[in-house]
């Protein structure tokens, strides 16, 4: 998928409306449109990477930042228990091919996830 046709790139660029729960120089956070928990946020890097497989060593700092922002957002929503998920590839449930971290909270979660 090219950046020009990427849903998340269009949201980040303001071409498609989206309410940012958080934004900084490296990422934005939006609510998932199909939530799987009472709190379900997506932490999306501004840099277009199709999946975790496309991240190189130079993106290690960015990946850490995405996880820290996810934790901060969960804590600001008064959740001290939450799950972070990165789906990589369609077989793992990735439906938008722009790397993003799901942050889910507000209900009990079991293991394995499914």
Tell what function each PLM region has.
Residues 1-114:
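HIT superfamily nucleotide-processing domains
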